[in-house]
Amino acid sequence: MTAPQASAWAASAGEPPRVASVNTWLRQMGPPDLDAVTAIEASAYSHPWTRGNFADALAGGYVAELLLSADGLIVGYVLGLYGHAETHLLNLTVAPAVQRQGHGRALLARLRELVRLRGDRQLWLEVRQSNAPAQRLYRQAGFEDIGLRRGYYPAGVHGREDALVMRLNLSGRGHGLD
């Protein structure tokens, strides 16, 4: 990564970060982070969220957490929407260059911690049927398949892809992130 890229991805909010692991930190996402988050999103997906999508989520009070590397670079993020006794995981993304290093698991664990603190009983999400690595992460964390949303995601120029709907019941014990 070049110096300009590194500075563009650098953390910028004022809240003190929380330790996620020996080499990573967590903190809330804020408006100053949107350029870096949007860059990661565009590098990770063929149909990424826009800067406006992220800005709307922040303005709407959605839960939005960042995962930072030891040198302060944003390496991933998670966004969720709180509901009545449940939370909908909307977006969990790790920069492609640092995927498969446990960062997604750390972000998912942080969201689960926040959801439990609220007293929510369920965490649910949609995931592309073609996204086997994400499905594996969610299943290892205790999520179960509960349905299918046909044509949920855009795919290609005019196509659509089905979404697998998954749920994690938080009222019990023994799930993969305990």
Model-derived regions: residue spans:
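Acetyl-CoA-dependent GNAT
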Residues: 3-9, 19-20, 24-101, 105-118, ...
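Generic short amphipathic/hydrophobic targeting helices enriched at N-termini
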Residues: 15-18, 123
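Active-site-proximal loop/turn and secondary-structure-junction residues that shape catalytic pockets
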Residues: 93, 129-131
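Short glycine/proline-centered loop/turn elements that form peptide/ligand docking sites
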Residues: 108, 131-134, 151-157
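Conserved GNAT acetyl-CoA-binding A-motif
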Residues: 115-126, 137
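Conserved catalytic-core motifs of GNAT/GCN5-like acyltransferases
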Residues: 126, 139, 144-165
